[in-house]
């Protein structure tokens, strides 16, 4: 549900061909490519999948003032979508699904010089909110303005992922998982279980919008 390739993410070393190859080795049913820049058409995705049976979907990871948001099924990028309010308004009118990506990365145990973008601006003393999912859900209204919360991110600590899952539970929000892979090494380290069998980016977006997803941590042992 969350991976980057060399086609649209300058910080990625993962080619689309290698992505498809590794995903098939892992018996994944599908992969959603969420580039930092640019997007894929369904026709381009089908060409890359090249008859392997792997379903490929397109989205975009957008950095907003409150954190990173995955916009699944984004038909085009427009100026101003880096503002969270503009992004939610655009999504509402265009059938786009929004997923808060790794919302609490660097929150529970931040590395030196880094902080969680989502919680850094809270006026409440950080110790009171450190691991309190109910307080965080109440203090951050943006978490209830997306369709799902990423609760199993392969590039985020277990503690931060667990806090995301707990907060989603408080909000009654559905969850997703994604590797956030920028190389072949991380593919499959965060997964999403989806009700039904979406085959296009629009169908995947609709599944997320109606809450038909669930985060699954770890690589798969078999197709699911």
Segments and roles (model prediction):
Residues 81-85, 101-102:
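Ordered, amphipathic secondary-structure segments that act as subunit-interaction surfaces
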Residues 60-62, 75, 102-104:
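Short, flexible active-site-adjacent loop segments at beta-strand->alpha-helix junctions, enriched
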Residues 36, 103-104, 154:
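Flexible loop residues that form catalytic
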Residues 24-31, 46-58:
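Non-catalytic interaction surface on structured domains
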Residues 1, 5, 9, 16-21, ...:
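Charged catalytic cores and adjacent phosphate/nucleic-acid-binding surfaces used
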Residues 92-109:
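Internal, conserved structured core segments that host functional sites
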Residues 1, 34, 60, 101, ...:
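Active-site flanking residues adjacent to catalytic metal/cofactor-binding acidic residues
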Residues 20-40, 96-99:
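Divalent metal-dependent hydrolysis catalytic cores, especially in the metallo-beta-lactamase
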């Amino acid at each position: 549900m969350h991976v980057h390739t060399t086609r649209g993410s300058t910080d990625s070393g993962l080619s689309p061909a290698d992505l498809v190859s590794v995903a098939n080795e892992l018996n994944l049913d599908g992969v959603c490519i969420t580039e930092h820049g640019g997007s894929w058409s369904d026709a381009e995705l089908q060409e890359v999948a090249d008859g392997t049976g792997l379903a490929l979907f397109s989205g975009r990871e957008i950095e907003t003032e409150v954190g990173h948001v995955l916009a699944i099924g984004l038909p085009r990028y427009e100026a101003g979508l880096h503002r969270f309010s503009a992004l939610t308004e655009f999504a509402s009118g265009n059938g786009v699904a929004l997923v808060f990506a790794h919302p609490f990365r660097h929150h529970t145990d931040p590395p030196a010089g880094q902080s969680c973008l989502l919680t850094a601006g809270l006026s409440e003393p950080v110790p009171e909110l450190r691991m309190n999912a109910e307080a965080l859900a109440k203090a951050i209204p943006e978490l209830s303005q997306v369709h799902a919360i990423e609760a199993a991110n392969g590039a985020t600590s277990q503690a931060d992922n667990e806090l995301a899952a707990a907060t989603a539970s408080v909000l009654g929000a559905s969850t997703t998982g994604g590797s956030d892979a920028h190389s072949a090494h991380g593919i499959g380290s965060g997964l999403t279980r989806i009700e039904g069998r979406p085959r296009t980016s629009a169908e995947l977006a609709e599944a997320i919008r109606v809450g038909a997803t669930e985060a699954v941590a770890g690589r798969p042992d078999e197709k699911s």
